[in-house]
Amino acid sequence: MFRCPICGFKTLRLFALKQHTRREHVLVKCPICGFTGKHLSQHFYSRYDIDHLIYCYLFSSFRLPKNVRLAIKRKLEVE
């Protein structure tokens, strides 16, 4: 199972979590560092730490390397 980092919603599939976050949540500032700006998805991608990359994966269409996607998957997994 995977858990939404914003509201705690749980789902069996990672893609369903990605759909949930895009449909249910609108981000106007970075929940990690508080950045507010025009290009929030670029901000998530340029800060190359796992917390920012989770939001990059969930909210943007950037293609992340496979090892990063696997790390994100492990971080979002719950039992």
Swiss-Prot record:
Domain of life: Viruses
Protein name, per record: Uncharacterized protein A-79
